[in-house]
């Protein structure tokens, strides 16, 4: 089941800001939520550390437990390092591609745009946030959706990071994204240790 509660509170639980909005709040209150959040946490077991890292990864990409487990199983079948393959698959989810390109303010907004039918891949509407975009494919905003405020903002680069992921070729003006390569781990700005997640599932 996916988490649907307050994202700032979730960021504090995870120990990292999970949305742009959470960044400024997290700087003020980086400790966990609740009455005892400021207290130093007790030392934790190796299992608890791995589980916590798995949860952070799951929350960051807005996945259910079942979805993340499936990503791990898929990654095991690929020839590369399992953790790096997990990150690559997560980055090629349609929702993540929209986020990385600056077409959405958060992964949650990206999911909503896709669910509401605003996004196409190679000219065909795709309404599945987990859809795996392949190198060479073109992601676009549907023509009739381009007059909506979120996409006017996207065209102006409101949500774009200073440095767009190098495996994407993005035109904010045209509201198009070309996936030019499969992401490499060093190109992905996520503050996680994916090896701990692999160890969690391999236990």
UniProtKB/Swiss-Prot annotation:
Tell me which InterPro entries the record gives.
Ribosomal_uS4, Ribosomal_uS4_bac-type, Ribosomal_uS4_CS, Ribosomal_uS4_N, S4_RNA-bd, S4_RNA-bd_sf
Sorted UniProt keywords: Ribonucleoprotein, Ribosomal protein, RNA-binding, rRNA-binding
Classification via Pfam families: Ribosomal_S4, S4
**NCBIfam families this protein is in?**
PRK05327.1 (NF003717), rpsD_bact (TIGR01017)
Family note = Belongs to the universal ribosomal protein uS4 family.
| Gene field | rpsD
Question: Native species of this protein?
Answer: Thermobifida fusca (strain YX)
Q: How does it assemble?
A: Part of the 30S ribosomal subunit. Contacts protein S5. The interaction surface between S4 and S5 is involved in control of translational fidelity.
Where does the S4 RNA-binding domain lie? 92-152
Listed name of the protein: Small ribosomal subunit protein uS4
- Record GO terms (molecular function): rRNA binding; structural constituent of ribosome
């Amino acid at each position: 089941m996916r988490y649907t509660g307050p994202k700032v509170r979730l960021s504090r639980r995870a120990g990292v800001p999970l949305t742009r909005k959470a960044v400024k709040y997290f700087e003020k209150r980086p400790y966990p939520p609740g009455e005892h959040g400021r207290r130093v946490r007790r030392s934790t077991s190796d299992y608890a550390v791995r589980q916590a890292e798995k949860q952070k990864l799951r929350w960051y990409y807005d996945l259910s437990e079942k979805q993340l487990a499936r990503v791990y199983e898929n990654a095991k079948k690929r020839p590369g390092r399992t953790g790096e393959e997990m990150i690559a698959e997560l980055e090629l989810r349609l929702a993540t591609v929209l986020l990385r390109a600056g077409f959405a303010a958060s992964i949650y907004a990206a999911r909503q745009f896709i669910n509401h039918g605003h996004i196409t891949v190679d000219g065909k509407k795709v309404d599945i946030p987990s859809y795996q975009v392949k190198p060479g494919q073109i992601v676009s905003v549907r023509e009739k959706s381009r007059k909506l405020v979120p996409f006017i903002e996207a065209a102006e680069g409101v949500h774009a990071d200073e440095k767009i992921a190098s495996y994407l070729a993005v035109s904010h003006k045209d509201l198009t994204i070309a996936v030019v390569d499969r992401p490499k781990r060093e190109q992905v700005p996520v503050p996680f240790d994916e090896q701990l997640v692999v160890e969690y599932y391999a236990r």
